């Protein structure tokens, strides 16, 4: 069912009210809100740990967590959002108290994906790094890696490429895999090889997660849950296990709600179900081509301005591929992704 759109005046009123609530003095701005004040403590900074419909779990500056109501003027709230919230005050007759989210700070980044029903849907906010997890089982897919890289570049979020399950490789197989991954090393992406089973490479991974908010992406079966259990402290592991067991014991598509976890050595993780498969149909052709960073030196140098980089004469990109300056695998993946977004059509999504 199509949602009713807000008018420009409604948007302005909501935004003004929202900005007003970012200041603590605004929390008793009318008589109706005075009833709320008796139920809630002082306003404080917090971060959204998880979102559940009209409620959210929020963590305060001292590490305390509480499920919260969300003010109606808060139009968008996702895991990772920095908020102004007020904890609920416990009462003897009602121990199941909830706090309230009053306002959301401006996001420094937001990870989105296209959705047939809701247009462009936010999944997580304030991310510093997308960890692209691949494995030798199932087969290593460079096309999937390139899709995640396009998203990372379009959002200006640092990507980290991670190959898991390397303990399953023979020395010769590992050498062949490394030749494929050198495509990314050669264009200055960081590539790590790890094993959640043996612990190889985990220390390097922990160093790359330090003091950052990361989100793990990748197909089912690449071992993300095993990695997280290796990285997370026991208290967070238990939360993760409970979240997984609610859905399935099979280890496939088991995360149903985005959640923020804390690494013991420092840094945070957002685990999100929507990150597993990316649709890129909401991106423009320009965003797609800019997502292939090694193309940037050649874009605009073709003979014809409308060059499609397929069989056009004097194509700078094709010439770079032939000279070995651009990997053919990446060039082929670019055309495959571009064909996909052309087929699906940007018109399917409302970005207003």
Swiss-Prot record:
Residues 1-21 have a biased composition (Basic residues). GO terms for biological process: ribosomal small subunit biogenesis. PROSITE patterns: ENGC_GTPASE, G_CP. It is found in: Cytoplasm. GO terms for molecular function: GTP binding; GTPase activity; metal ion binding; rRNA binding. It is an enzyme of class 3 (hydrolase). Its EC number is 3.6.1.-. NCBIfam families: PRK12288.1 (NF008931), ribosome small subunit-dependent GTPase A (TIGR00157). HAMAP family: GTPase_RsgA. Monomer. Associates with 30S ribosomal subunit, binds 16S rRNA. This is Small ribosomal subunit biogenesis GTPase RsgA. It comes from Hamiltonella defensa subsp. Acyrthosiphon pisum (strain 5AT).
């Amino acid at each position: 069912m199509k949602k009713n759109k807000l008018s420009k005046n409604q948007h302005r009123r909501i935004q003004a009210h929202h900005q007003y609530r970012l200041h603590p003095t605004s929390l008793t701005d009318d008589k109706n809100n005075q009833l709320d004040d008796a139920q809630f403590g002082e306003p404080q900074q917090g971060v959204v740990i998880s979102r559940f419909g009209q409620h959210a779990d929020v963590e305060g500056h001292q590490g305390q967590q509480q499920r919260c109501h969300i003010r109606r003027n808060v139009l968008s709230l996702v895991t990772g959002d920095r908020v102004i919230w007020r904890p609920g005050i416990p009462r003897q007759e009602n121990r199941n108290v909830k706090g309230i989210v009053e306002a959301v700070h401006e996001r420094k980044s937001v990870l989105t994906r296209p959705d047939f029903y809701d247009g462009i849907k936010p999944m997580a906010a304030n991310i510093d790094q997308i960890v692209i997890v691949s494995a030798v089982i199932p087969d290593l897919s460079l096309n999937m890696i390139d899709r995640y890289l396009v998203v990372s570049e379009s959002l200006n979020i640092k990507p980290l490429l991670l190959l898991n399950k390397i303990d399953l490789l023979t020395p010769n197989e590992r050498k062949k895999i490394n030749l494929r991954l050198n495509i990314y090393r050669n264009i200055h992406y960081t590539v790590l090889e790890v094993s959640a089973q043996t612990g190889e490479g985990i220390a390097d991974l922990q160093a790359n997660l330090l003091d950052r908010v990361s989100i793990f992406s990748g197909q089912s079966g690449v071992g993300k849950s095993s990695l997280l259990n290796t990285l997370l402290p026991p208290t967070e592991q238990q939360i993760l296990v409970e979240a997984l067991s609610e859905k399935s014991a099979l280890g496939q598509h088991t995360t149903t709600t985005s959640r923020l976890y804390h690494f013991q050595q420092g840094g945070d993780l957002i685990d999100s179900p929507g990150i597993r498969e990316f649709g890129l149909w909401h991106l423009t052709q320009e965003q797609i081509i800019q997502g292939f960073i090694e193309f940037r030196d050649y874009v605009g140098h073709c003979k014809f301005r409308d060059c499609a980089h397929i069989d056009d004469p004097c194509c700078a990109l094709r010439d770079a591929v032939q000279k070995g300056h651009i990997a053919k695998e990446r060039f082929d993946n670019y055309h495959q992704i571009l064909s996909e977004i052309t087929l699906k059509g940007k018109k399917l999504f409302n970005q207003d």
